[in-house]
């Protein structure tokens, strides 16, 4: 769908601050800064006794025999990032769901899939030296 406009996220860093968490999403073409709440960093670091949203997503994906194909951070508006998670339904169809990029980063803790940023988001937000 966005094949020619996707740039792979090669790595990311977590930079916690007193009032927010900064994720630095690194591509070959620049770094995209993604600011999130402190709660996102906490969800990445802690083990929870009960399932949180990301555990439930993983369970639903497995329970319905879905496979996460990729995620694309495809839009930014007023400093808010938007993403789509692409799911393969047993080879029958690929569906996309709207998802917050911060949720994707937590989901990547337990599930491996490619993460991309659209060229238009990269052009609008990329910074060097952060």
Predicted features and spans:
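Divalent-cation
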Residues: 1-130
């Amino acid at each position: 769908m966005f094949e020619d406009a996707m740039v792979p996220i090669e790595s990311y860093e977590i930079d916690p601050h007193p009032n927010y968490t900064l994720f630095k999403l690194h591509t070959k073409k620049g770094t995209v800064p993604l600011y999130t709440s402190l709660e996102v960093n906490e969800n990445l670091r802690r083990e929870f006794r009960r399932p949180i949203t990301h555990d439930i997503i993983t369970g639903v994906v497995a329970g319905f025999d879905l496979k996460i194909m990729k995620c694309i951070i495809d839009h930014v508006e007023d400093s808010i990032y938007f993403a789509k998670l692409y799911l393969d339904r047993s080879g029958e169809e690929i569906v996309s769901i709207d998802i917050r990029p911060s949720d994707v980063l937590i989901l990547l803790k337990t599930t491996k899939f490619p993460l991309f940023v659209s060229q238009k988001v990269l052009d609008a937000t990329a910074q060097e030296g952060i």
